[in-house]
Each structure stands twice: as structure tokens, then as C-alpha cells.
Amino acid sequence: MQPNDITFFQRFQDDILAGRKTITIRDESESHFKTGDVLRVGRFEDDGYFCTIEVTATSTVTLDTLTEKHAEQENMTLTELKKVIADIYPDQTQFYVIEFKCL
């Protein structure tokens, strides 16, 4: 079995598969992904594969510069997005936006 290249919390799986979630915001440890990369995607909880994505763009962002567009691409409100990011990455301010599409 091939290893997964990136994982998402299971709660995001349906939104990814339906095309409602089209970005992910990560910390520096996952800043190496580049436009054009094709990635196997698994669930964080069990590493079970559930789709393949292609990276369509990358950029940097801070918690303070997150926008309504980022929130829309994450399929949540801006307030929810800021809370999720702060919960996952406490005490961090610099993040990496990975835009993607399911293949």
C-alpha cells in the first residue's frame, strides 16, 4: 500500500470529496507542497486513503490576514476558520495555504 502524502481530519472528508473545501491551511512543516503536485490524501485519525488531489496554487497567510474568501474555500465562516487554525496551531502566526482540486 502506498503511503498518503497529506492527511485531513475525518470531519473534512465529505467537504473535500464534494468540492466544498478547496484549500488547506498548514504550518511550516507542510510548506513544501508545490503547484502541480499530485497527492494521495488520507484521514488523520486512521491514515485511510480517500482521494487524490492536485495542488493548484500555494501562498502564505497570517491569522490576521485570513479573509472571507479563505473561509469560503474552507466551507466555514471566518470566525470558525480562525478558531480552527488557532486550535490546531496554537501560538503560531505564519501559515501556508494550499489550494487543491480532487482528481
Curated annotation (Swiss-Prot):
This protein's source sits in the domain of life called: Bacteria
Q: What UniProt keywords are attached to this protein's entry? A: Hydrolase
What SMART domains would the database entry show?
A: ASCH
Cellular component (GO) terms are:
cytosol
A molecular function (GO) term: hydrolase activity, acting on carbon-nitrogen (but not peptide) bonds, in linear amidines
Q: Which reaction does it catalyse?
A: N(4)-acetylcytidine + H2O = cytidine + acetate + H(+); N(4)-acetyl-2'-deoxycytidine + H2O = 2'-deoxycytidine + acetate + H(+); N(4)-acetylcytosine + H2O = cytosine + acetate + H(+)
Q: Which InterPro entries match?
A: AC4CH (IPR008314), ASCH_domain (IPR007374), PUA-like_sf (IPR015947)
Kindly indicate whether the keyword Iron belongs to this entry.
Answer: no
Q: What is its EC number?
A: 3.5.1.135
Is Hydrolase given among the entry's keywords? yes
- Give the residues annotated as active site: K21 (proton acceptor), T24 (nucleophile), E74 (proton donor)
Question: For the ASCH domain, which residue ranges apply?
Answer: 6-101
What is stated as this protein's family in its record? Belongs to the N(4)-acetylcytidine amidohydrolase family.
Entry function: Catalyzes the hydrolysis of N(4)-acetylcytidine (ac4C).
Concerning NCBIfam families, the annotation shows: PRK04980.1
The UniProt entry, under HAMAP family, shows: ac4C_amidohydr
Its protein name is: N(4)-acetylcytidine amidohydrolase
Q: Which organism is it from?
A: Escherichia coli O1:K1 / APEC
Gene name, please? yqfB
